[in-house]
Amino acid sequence: MRCEVPLPLLGLLLCVVGAAAQGGQEEFAVEISGTTVTITCPSSGDDVKWKPDPKMVVNNKYIIQNHDSSPLTVSCTAGDEEHTMYLNAKVCANCEELDTFTVVGIIAADLLITLGVLILVYYFSKNKKGQSRAAAGSRPRAQKMRRPPPVPNPDYEPIRKGQRDVYAGLEHRGF
């Protein structure tokens, strides 16, 4: 019972300290367009050195053309500061990025169209219930004719009223 109050307080303290520790770190800027990945170093300056391949640098930005979606560790050094990033970007040539508003709009439009079709089907089927027209080439139907009962199968012998055999009738037997 004594640990109920300190545990939430300890959790809050850990969140505040963790956020303060992460707040000082600068982040890489990553842009993905088709199969091209452009990475900008968080350190500003003209003497930024990139690893693993310093040849892929244009205007202090590390540009990977035709990236094959394989994981890659990229690091940049500006002066005495070194920043390292693990890049695991999935890229494709014909991909399009959709924002949340577009996806929600597509789903809402689909639901509205479906609801409209349901309402149309309901109203059109409601009006057709009582209407029944005879087709052009059909003849009027007569009342259902009664058929005679089917002929009994000659393979089975009918049960006679006076017969008292074991299988002559249905009897209740207790097991």
Curated annotation (Swiss-Prot):
> Organism source for this protein?
Gallus gallus
- Membrane-side (Extracellular) residue stretches: 22-100
Task: State a single Gene Ontology molecular function.
Answer: transmembrane signaling receptor activity
Free-text function comment from the UniProt entry? The CD3 complex mediates signal transduction, resulting in T-cell activation and proliferation. Required for normal immune responses.
Tell me the domain of life.
Eukaryota
Instruction: Mention any Pfam family matching this sequence.
Output: Ig_5
Every copy of the ITAM domain together lies at 146-173
Q: How does it assemble?
A: The TCR/CD3 complex of T-lymphocytes consists of either a TCR alpha/beta or TCR gamma/delta heterodimer coexpressed at the cell surface with the invariant subunits of CD3 labeled gamma, delta, epsilon, zeta, and eta.
Q: What GO biological process terms does the UniProt entry carry, in alphabetical order? A: cell surface receptor signaling pathway; positive thymic T cell selection
Lineage per the UniProt record = Eukaryota, Metazoa, Chordata, Craniata, Vertebrata
- Gene that codes for this? CD3E
Q: What is this protein called?
A: T-cell surface glycoprotein CD3 epsilon chain
